[in-house]
Curated annotation (Swiss-Prot):
Key words, A-Z: Antiport, Calcium, Calcium transport, Ion transport, Membrane, Transmembrane, Transmembrane helix, Transport, Vacuole
GO CC annotation terms, alphabetical: plant-type vacuole membrane
Gene assigned in the entry: CAX1b
Family according to the record: Belongs to the Ca(2+):cation antiporter (CaCA) (TC 2.A.19) family. Cation/proton exchanger (CAX) subfamily.
Protein name: Vacuolar cation/proton exchanger 1b
Cytoplasmic side: 1-67, 110-126, 182-194, 254-283, 349-364, 410-414
């Protein structure tokens, strides 16, 4: 069956399946903070010209292209995807490939969120929630797996650490600061219950990172000479399994027993119709169409992520920046730009629960799911990746979680809290800017640091 015909028949079934799942307008549908954040970057597209196309199959195909490619404010960045592929095959400079690939990942990440939400219309709330949880940080997962395949453990660790720090300090800090300025005379309350759950899980994560680090120092100092040199690696693998168990319990807690804690308040009507996300309650793609597009977007994301991983050293040498700085600072900022922008937009509208759900939810997912999955996948590949992220990285993570927890304990925000978080991120960024690692691979477990003078 031709793809265009499949898409056309799939779209005719969309409304029937939506009725079956009680998801037509007028009936409530649970939407996570990630859904709402990504939706803030979507826009309506004029499809009136499509009605003049005589062929029904072609009209359906063009309608799908319109719904997937033109209903996002980031559609102008899609040419970067093709340019990155062309730059690779035409043997342009690797730095150009790196930059174009990073830019191309921005709209792809937003479209992956859109497509998983479309599929969730037909799968019900539980499976839809699992889909959103799985694809919420798919870019980080793909980059981590591809870097593991090339043995670049330092890139894996630094990129995941950078995503956590970026969500906790930069995204949340920017959102709180701009929300405080935009709503200077208004109260900015938020529900602390969700924040407490996420910070507790983040503290568990930093404990699992700290123990292998302390064990390595204990072994090298001779305090526990009876302990084998691989003890930290074995401990990391055990901790990773326990972290995944904790994450599964967190999903059950979030999607079943205490889902009311994670449901953002309904977005009220605003003057800007593009931000009325609560009205977006009807699928625009059929199930088959959404699955096809999801597979295509995932393949493109994997392709560009591979370009990023293979060219990061060239960018590091060209820009005279350490690989750790690019991985911790630049990759997370660009890779999650769409989601971060959505969090800031809702903060400006004083929808702080959505902003917290995006920033804390992403940090929790990366620390409790993506990181342990990376360790276990490396285990199956025979790669000795552990949870020892080195003293500087682990200390930065612990302090970031601590500052965030203290900032959110009152249940009300103002711009000074946001400014403090942003400045904390700036201090950490400067710290990683002034250091260089002598061993870029990081596969031997020994890391020497040089300070840029």
């Amino acid at each position: 069956m031709p793809v265009s015909r499949m898409m056309m028949e799939s779209n005719t079934m969309a409304k029937e399946m939506a009725v079956r799942h009680h998801l037509l307008p007028g009936s409530p549908r649970r939407r996570t903070a990630h859904n709402l954040s990504s939706s803030s970057l979507r826009k309506s597209s004029d499809a009136s010209l499509l009605h003049k196309v005589p062929c029904a199959a072609l009209r359906s195909l063009l309608a799908n292209l319109n719904d997937v490619l033109l209903t996002t404010r980031l559609f102008l960045l899609f040419p970067a995807v093709l340019l990155a592929i062309a730059a690779t095959y035409l043997h342009f400079g690797q730095v150009w490939v790196f930059v174009l690939s990073l830019i191309g990942l921005v709209p792809l990440a937003e479209r992956l969120s859109f497509l998983t939400e479309q599929i969730a219309f037909y799968t019900g709330p539980t499976v839809g929630g699992l889909l959103n949880a799985t694809f919420g940080n798919v870019t980080e997962v793909i980059i981590a797996l591809l870097a593991l395949r090339e043995g670049k453990i330092e890139v894996v660790k630094c990129s995941l650490l950078g995503s956590i720090l970026s969500n906790l300090l930069l995204v949340l800090g920017t959102s709180l600061f701009l929300a405080g300025i935009a709503n200077l005379r208004a109260h900015q309350p938020y529900d602390t219950k969700q924040a407490h759950v996420n910070t507790a899980l983040l503290m568990l994560a930093v404990l699992c990172h700290s123990l292998p680090l302390m064990l390595r120092y204990a072994v090298t100092s001779g305090d526990h000479a009876i302990v084998s040199g691989d003890a930290a690696l074995h401990l990391s693998r055990a901790c990773s399994i326990l972290m995944l168990i904790a994450y599964l319990a967190y999903l059950f807690f979030q999607l079943n027993t205490h889902r009311q804690l994670f449901e953002p308040q309904q977005v009220e009507d605003d003057d800007d119709d593009d931000l009325v996300i609560a009205q977006d309650d009807e699928p625009v793609l059929g199930f088959s169409s959404a699955m096809i597009w999801l597979a295509l977007m995932t393949l493109l994301t994997a392709l560009l992520s591979g370009y990023v991983v293979s060219t990061i050293e060239a960018a590091s040498e060209s820009w005279e920046l350490s690989v750790s700085f690019i991985s911790i600072i630049l990759l997370p900022i660009v890779g999650n730009a769409a989601e971060h922008a959505g969090a800031v937009i809702f903060a400006l509208k004083n929808k702080m629960d959505i902003t917290l759900g995006v920033s804390l939810g992403s940090a929790t997912q990366i620390s409790m799911f993506v990181v342990p999955v990376s360790v276990i996948v490396a285990w199956t590949m025979g790669i000795p990746m552990d949870l020892d992220f080195n003293l500087l990285e682990t200390g930065s993570l612990f302090l970031a979680i601590l500052v965030t927890a203290f900032t959110l304990q009152e249940g009300e925000s103002h711009y000074l809290k946001g400014l403090i978080l942003v400045l904390c991120y700036a201090v950490i960024s400067v710290c990683f800017f002034v250091i260089r690692r002598r061993s870029a691979g990081g596969t031997d477990g020994v890391h020497h640091l040089d300070v840029i003078v």
